[in-house]
Every structure is written in C-alpha cells, then in structure tokens.
Amino acid sequence: MAHRVLLLLSLASAAAVAAAVDAEDPLIRQVVPGGDDNDLELNAESHFLSFVQRFGKSYKDADEHAYRLSVFKDNLRRARRHQLLDPSAEHGVTKFSDLTPAEFRRTYLGLRKSRRALLRELGESAHEAPVLPTDGLPDDFDWRDHGAVGPVKNQGSCGSCWSFSASGALEGAHYLATGKLEVLSEQQFVDCDHECDSSEPDSCDSGCNGGLMTTAFSYLQKAGGLESEKDYPYTGSDGKCKFDKSKIVASVQNFSVVSVDEAQISANLIKHGPLAIGINAAYMQTYIGGVSCPYICGRHLDHGVLLVGYGASGFAPIRLKDKPYWIIKNSWGENWGENGYYKICRGSNVRNKCGVDSMVSTVSAVHASKE
C-alpha cells in the first residue's frame, strides 16, 4: 500500500513539473550560455514534453517519439552554440526543434542557387537597378506602418519560400500603384510557375522544390499577373495549375536587382516598397527574437524572405550601443520569431551579414482589375 502511495505521489510530482515547464521557462525561452550540458540532459524530457504540448506535436509510435527526443536534445545544444555565436539575439526552442538541420533545410528552405547573385557581388546584372540618391534617408523606416505589408503567412512543409517573397514584394508594389493592399496567391506560383533563369537553364522554379524570386517575376510578366489568395488559396503542396487569367488582381510592370550596397537597398526599399531578398538561414531554426548578428555566418543563400524596413535602435549587449538592423518578414507563421518577423544587423561593420545584401530585387506593379 505504501509503495502504491509513493508511486502515485511520484507521478503527481512529475505531472506538476511538466505543467510548470511552459513557454516562459528560461531554457525554453532562451538557451542561456551559462548553463551546462548535464542540466540540459537532466531536464530535456520535461522541456520536450512542454514543446510537444505547446506546438501540438504528435509522433506515429514510441520509436519516433524517442528519435525526436534525441533530435530535440541535439537542438538544445545547437541553440546554445547559436546563443554564444549570436549574443544580440535570443536562441532557444522553436517549433522546428524536433527536426535535424538537414530535415529543416529540405522542408522549409527553397531558394535555388543562382549565378545571378554571384554576378551581383561582381557588379554585373542584366536587370541592375539604377542608382538612387541616398541623401536624407530616414534613420528608421517600416512599410508595416504605411499599409504596404500583408499578414504573416505560413508556407508549411513546402520549400516555397521564394513564392512568398515574390508575392509579398508584389503586394507592396501593387499597394504603391493602386492604394489597395491585395493578399496575393503563392499557390499560383507553386502550381504554374516553371520559369528558368536565363543564365542557368537547369535552374527552374519548381513549386515545393524551390525557386527564385526574379524568375517568378519573369513568369508573371508572361502570364499576365497573379490571382488573389482568396481565388487561388494555398495548399502547401504541388498541384495542377488552375490559373484563371480573368481573376488577375496584380501585374508586374518590371523588376530589377539592387546593387550590394546598403544605402542603395534602403533607398530602393523606400521608393519601391518591400523587397524580395535571399538570406542564409543558418541561425533561423533556433531564432526567437532580438537582432541577429552572428560572429560567423556564411553567404550561401538558401531562403527567400521579404525586406520590409530597417531600424537603428536594436540593442547590442556586447558593444553596449545601438545596432542597426533590417526588418524581415518570414513565411513560417506568427508563432516563429518576433510574431513572424526576423531582425538581422546591418551597417558598415557587418556588411552583408548572412548574405542579406547579395540577392535583392525590386518590382513595380501595374493596376489590374477584374472584368
């Protein structure tokens, strides 16, 4: 009898501990550099239970559950490394913490390699944007404050980030041209856009298997435009093209790529609206918030996102001064990052961090109304 009571008390205690571990748990919220591996190992199962409950995760059997727990433990250690390498941001448990880095890249990153990005680094491009004046640029600017940015969307388990970047840029351009913010269709790109880069005939837009924003704009010029999300809703999977030209709500007039110069990027952002950009997403799987400015980050681009603004007041604890940053809209839902947004540092001391300046394109829209 006493043994049974002791067992019940132990189970109740374990349940209470699990319930207490929630989104505000300091390890869940942020992997603290001062912790040790033994603490992570001892508490990993409780943190994993909280993670499963918070994000509604389910696994097919006990073996899969055990495997995902082991991946979760690896990602706790990885988030700690990211925290050490990127101290001005917060890194910790996200909804992707049960995925290996390879699974994450394969499922959520879909920006195809492009020779055009290399040409831009070398100052060459067939669609180079004209140089704009940069005197008098504001210290802070955010298109969300001016009505040109739609709601944060979720690409799901589909490498269609490029389509969200392209549609977001056209949403902003269409707003500047017409004064109306339309929520545009990414699924039209996924199903119907098979445009190839002229410099790389084998690199074509391929739905959930990846694509490029510039080739997406080329497709729209040929197709006539893009339908609304309402008329052509997102499914998160490759499907048969159902494009209806009579339902076009936004069309591309022209597009160009912006030089690898932060002042020019800022000037184009203000003049043309949100910009379609590529980025190295190496630190984004564990990102929770703050200004990301990792000491080490490659410039290999693997994720398409939308640049919507910039600021100058991101606090940098290492240098005890403000760190300027870009404001980036992502396509992983509002329960990632800062309500779906990412901040990454900019400025002369950190030029082109994670390749953020390497692939930037602007688009101009013409008005297209339903007949």
Curated annotation (Swiss-Prot):
Q: Which PROSITE patterns match?
A: THIOL_PROTEASE_ASN, THIOL_PROTEASE_CYS, THIOL_PROTEASE_HIS
Q: In which tissues is it expressed?
A: Expressed during the late stages of seed ripening, in mature seeds and during germination.
Q: What does UniProt list as catalytic?
A: 161, 303, 330
Please name every pair of cysteines joined by a disulfide bond in this record: 158-208, 192-241, 297-354
Q: What organism is recorded for this protein?
A: Zea mays (Maize)
Q: Which UniProt keywords apply?
A: Disulfide bond, Glycoprotein, Hydrolase, Protease, Signal, Thiol protease, Zymogen
EC numbers for this chain:
3.4.22.-
Record's protein name = Cysteine proteinase 1
Does the keyword field hold Protease? yes
The domain of life is: Eukaryota
Q: Which GO terms describe its biological process?
A: proteolysis involved in protein catabolic process
Positions annotated as pro-peptide in this chain are 19-136
